[in-house]
Amino acid sequence: MWTPRIAVNHWLLVTTAIFGFLTFIWIPQASAECQTRSIYCYECDSWTDARCKDPFNYTALPRDQPPLMTCNGCCVKMVRHQRSPYEVVRRMMCTSQLQINLFMVDHVCMMESSGNGHMCFCEEDMCNSSKDLHTNGCQLHLITIAVAMSWLMGQLLSR
């Protein structure tokens, strides 16, 4: 007999399978690309280097711009508002300097839990220079959908 509980379980199984398949296809491709080729990333810290600011002065001589480094991972940009929204500390680097699993972070921007900062990852030459570094978004949408579905299923199954 087809009951609402069976329908919900069936829907959850199908949706989980689709989500798992999409995650299996999209995320490893992006991570593999990020790990297999070298790119150039800016490396600087605005706390100690005045050249590390948004936006960069692209008309300045190379010695007056933040240093570039060869990166065998993704570029990283961390921005943190210290004491006020106007006092911003920026740090740019390569993921090889962090203890981070690229499978989890590629094309992602993560907000600090306090809301005072964020960390973004990208995989093109000098991409961590951008003032408006944004995420690709497809993984964020999938994660949001998965969390919403989990909550909804929990609500439906608890009845």
Curated annotation (Swiss-Prot):
It is found in: Cell membrane; Membrane raft. It is a lipid-anchor; GPI-anchor. Coiled coil: none annotated. It comes from the Eukaryota. The chain crosses the membrane at residues 137-157. CDD domains: TFP_LU_ECD_Qvr. Disulfide bonds join 41-75, 44-52, 71-94, 109-120, 122-127. Glycans are attached at residue 57. GO terms for cellular component: external side of plasma membrane; membrane raft; plasma membrane. Residues 1-32 form the signal peptide. N-glycosylated probably on Asn-57. Residues 54-67 are annotated as: Loop 1. Residues 129-159 form a propeptide. Keywords: Biological rhythms, Cell membrane, Disulfide bond, Glycoprotein, GPI-anchor, Lipoprotein, Membrane, Signal, Transmembrane, Transmembrane helix. A lipid is attached at residue 128 (GPI-anchor amidated asparagine). GO terms for biological process: negative regulation of membrane potential; positive regulation of circadian sleep/wake cycle, sleep; regulation of circadian sleep/wake cycle, sleep; regulation of synaptic transmission, cholinergic; rhythmic process; sleep. Expressed in mushroom body (at protein level); overlaps with expression of Sh/shaker and nicotinic acetylcholine receptor (nAChR) components also involved in sleep regulation. Expressed in the adult brain and head. Enriched in the mushroom body, anterior optic tubercle, superior protocerebrum, antennal nerve and visual projection neuron fibers projecting into the lobula plate of the optic lobe. Residues 77-91 are annotated as: Loop 2. Interacts (via loop 2 of the three-fingered Ly-6 domain) with Sh/shaker; this interaction may stabilize both components of the complex and may be required for targeting or retention of Sh/shaker to neural cell projections. Interacts (via loop 2 of the three-fingered Ly-6 domain) with nAChRalpha3 and potentially other nicotinic acetylcholine receptors; this interaction is required for antagonism of nicotinic acetylcholine receptors. PANTHER family: ATILLA, ISOFORM B-RELATED-RELATED (PTHR33562), PROTEIN QUIVER (PTHR33562:SF31). Belongs to the quiver family. Bifunctional regulator of neuronal activity in the mushroom body, and possibly other regions of the brain, that acts as a signaling molecule required for homeostatic regulation of sleep under normal conditions and after sleep deprivation. Reduces neuronal excitability by enhancing Sh/shaker K(+) channel activity; possibly by stabilizing Sh/shaker to increase protein levels, accelerating its activation kinetics, slowing C-type inactivation and enhancing recovery from inactivation. Specifically affects the A-type K(+) current. This is UPAR/Ly6 domain-containing protein qvr. The gene is qvr.
